[in-house]
From Swiss-Prot:
GO terms for molecular function: rRNA (pseudouridine-N3-)-methyltransferase activity. One of its GO terms (cellular component) is cytoplasm. Specifically methylates the pseudouridine at position 1915 (m3Psi1915) in 23S rRNA. Its EC number is 2.1.1.177. This is Ribosomal RNA large subunit methyltransferase H. It comes from Brevibacillus brevis (strain 47 / JCM 6285 / NBRC 100599). It comes from the Bacteria. InterPro entries: Alpha/beta_knot_MTases, RlmH-like, tRNA_m1G_MTases_N. S-adenosyl-L-methionine binds at residues 76, 108, 127-132. Pfam families: SPOUT_MTase. It is found in: Cytoplasm. Homodimer. It catalyses: pseudouridine(1915) in 23S rRNA + S-adenosyl-L-methionine = N(3)-methylpseudouridine(1915) in 23S rRNA + S-adenosyl-L-homocysteine + H(+). CDD domains: RlmH-like.
Length: 159
């Protein structure tokens, strides 16, 4: 399976980079992983609703340019479905069974995802009703994808 993580902005925090590097290494035994960082749009501290939509739209265009036509897209969105780790594993198994070997997970910037990205998504996933920094979500996502592969193969993993 080929997994792409398409995310807005560059990761600067060393502690997050170390965690992401660790899970990327672990995942290499299960899939081909690609992390694609698209540039975030520069935005002032105080923005109108129209300016916020414009920022999301520009970031969305950059995201959509990275999505391949045949990829199954799972967008992380606050109003997405909340899945257990077992459900994520089952969904990934189902995709593989149906020949959908290319999966893209999309993480928006600090303002979230543009409507055009949400419309392109095949599924919307939420980790919580809480809001997390999008950089931290990268690490959590990689850990959950790793956990999903371990569950799928019946390998031990902390519950």
């Amino acid at each position: 399976m080929q997994i792409s993580i398409i995310t807005v902005g560059k990761l600067k925090e060393k502690y997050l980079r170390e965690g992401i590097d660790e899970y990327s290494k672990r995942l290499s035994a299960y899939c081909k992983l690609q992390v694609i960082e698209v540039n975030d749009e520069k935005a002032p501290e105080e923005m109108s609703a129209a300016e916020m939509e414009q920022v999301k739209r520009k970031e969305g265009e950059r995201i959509l340019a990275q999505i391949k036509q045949d990829q199954y897209v799972i967008a992380l969105a606050i109003d997405g479905q909340m899945w257990s780790s077992e459900k994520l594993s089952a969904e990934m198994d189902k995709l593989a069974l149906h020949g959908r070997s290319q999966v893209a997970f999309v993480i928006g910037g600090s303002l979230g995802l543009a409507d055009q990205v949400l419309k392109r998504a095949d599924a919307l996933l939420s980790f919580s009703k809480m809001t997390f920094p999008h950089q931290l979500v990268r690490l959590v996502l990689l850990e959950q994808v790793y956990r999903a592969f371990r569950i799928s193969r019946g390998e031990p993993y902390h519950k």
